[in-house]
Regions:
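N-terminal beta1-alpha1-beta2 submodule of the flavodoxin-like/Rossmannoid cofactor-binding fold
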Residues: 1-76, 83-85, 90, 94, ...
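Glycine-rich phosphate/pyrophosphate-binding loop and the adjoining helix
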Residues: 128-158
């Protein structure tokens, strides 16, 4: 069985958790990237995507350099933007068929999960999910979720 970890990270929070997972699981890693990068100005991105506007935004993502058919398990990581998945992950889920894959999503947020997992489950068969809550100051890179919860999530994938 091969495992692929696919994630998008804007502020670095999701990458932090992806790296933690990668350190414990033998898996290939793909960082999803929009063709046209988002602004480096955090407030500008918040203003553009607030009020669930991200649901309506279609963006193009860079092509994956892997063949998804080669993987049995897919770990998906995304920040939560306005109670939902990011436009980057939404495009990935719309573009790639994950039928027959065991999918393990994790999210990062400051406490506002919303409908994120429900939206992911609308695209694929979720085996186990993990919500990693960070402090409200995204620059701190400090999560509040227990290491034990993260460990249990990782063990469920093994």
């Amino acid at each position: 069985m091969k495992t692929l970890l696919v994630y998008y990270s804007y502020t670095g929070q999701t990458k932090l958790i992806a790296d933690k997972i990668k350190s414990k699981i033998d898996c290939d890693v793909v960082e999803l990237k929009p063709v046209i990068p988002f602004s480096n100005d955090y407030q500008e991105v918040v203003d553009e995507y607030q009020n669930n506007e991200s649901d309506k935004k279609c963006i193009e993502i860079e092509e994956l350099n892997v063949n998804l058919d080669a993987y049995d398990k897919i770990i998906i990581g995304t920040p939560v933007w306005w109670y939902s998945i990011t436009p980057v992950l939404r495009e990935f889920l719309n573009k790639y068929d994950l039928s027959g894959k065991k999918v393990y999503p994790f999210t990062t947020n400051a406490g506002w999960l919303g409908r994120t997992f429900k939206e992911i489950k609308g695209h694929c068969d979720v085996k186990k999910e993990l919500n990693v809550q960070f402090t409200e100051d995204w620059r701190e890179h400090k999560y509040l979720t227990s290491d034990n919860e993260i460990k249990e999530f990782i063990e469920s994938i093994l």
